[in-house]
């Protein structure tokens, strides 16, 4: 409570007045930050923010998945969530930053690179977005969330939070002279004031942080050597006393494994030598530590020697690289996969492709039951062939004896006997004659195979009023667009989609092509895609000109409707 309230009290200071005790010759840099006590306030502010965020994520965000802390970008850089929360809230919140495109500025102010804007946005959504909205509702006095009940938070911390939020609200009303009209306005106002002081404090600490990092890196080498000695000692202890706890993987090894997973071909990571050369390498190598750690984790026996005996059974060819003296980690087979390819006596079964093939079941229990042939054809066999539709039976073919047969080998007999050969009436006459002849030859199969709804025969199921309505919707050239089908369904509710599509392809499109072949036989473009492309190039704003003709698909299981 004290840290939060002191920051809020500092906002009420009138900075237009110059203190009398301030020396004009003293520069702002010469003022000791410790004298103002603001560094202590920032630390207390962060100490209240972090446990609240940890408890909130564990309480409300555990269902969405595990959120590791600290948060890291895709490049492996750690993100200061407190600084990110201050910067986003200072610029108006997540929605305002996204609408204004200010994520690059937020990323730079948060100490990240410009290409980390996408990662920072994702981290804010996962970690801080719900937390910020929850704080805004608490400040506004929402009865559902005003009582802070988070697991893992002490009563003293809850009291500090409640006191801080109430004081922020009081300071905002005192400064503005009215209550906040927008949800979260008090918290945004307070954070805007706090961010300016936090930035000054953060810049002042930056130089000291760089020195601390160098000092830490210098001591890190000695710490690593000590860790290697401890690892070597633990190897002896584990083999001599199997009852002790298993080996733990060092952080450096885990970092090396993470780098290998990101880019296995990175030359800076080094290469893994041949298995025969492993003995000459010490345990300080990351890959050697990783192998020892894996062996300790996969060892189920009490004796350490049994694990190495099992490892010795692995064939050396698994670790040999045909291209050179080293091999890639990704090309290595695991011991468990190789063990499955071994028989009981240790002989190889075959390649991995042969292992994946299903085994053929051989024996009397796995044979198909085939009845013995008696030489007599049972009458029940015909039921497996279904019902014969065509060719017709002898009784049905008696009516077809009077059908005029075409002469074989004579070819097409031209010209026809019509008054106007090649006219529309001539073509319709010959099509009708051929259809009637086919109807006599097929018999009932003519209707079962839906020949009666092919071509202009579809018109027999349409009334004159329905034809007049659907022709009024047709464009030139005709197009089977979704808008056309929707309008046709509106004015013809009794017609299904299948009937409308059938009419388009069997009547409208054929009549249009027939007119084209007679009127402009040398200038026919039947490709509807070309029409769409030309309309797009001319940038015709009319939606009808840019309609792309999509195929209308019908389900084969749908019943035929006339």
UniProtKB/Swiss-Prot annotation:
Alphabetized SMART domains for the sequence: ARID (SM01014), BRIGHT (SM00501), ELM2 (SM01189)
Chain ranges of the ELM2 domain: 358-448
Subcellular location per the Swiss-Prot or TrEMBL entry: Nucleus
Pfam families noted in UniProt: ARID
A GO CC term assigned to this protein in UniProt: generative cell nucleus
Gene3D superfamilies: ARID DNA-binding domain
Keywords: DNA-binding, Nucleus, Repressor, Transcription, Transcription regulation
Domain ARID: 43-136
GO biological process, one term: pollen sperm cell differentiation
Keyword DNA-binding in annotation: yes
MF (Gene Ontology): DNA binding
NAD recorded as keyword: no
Record protein name field: AT-rich interactive domain-containing protein 1
Organism for this UniProt entry: Arabidopsis thaliana
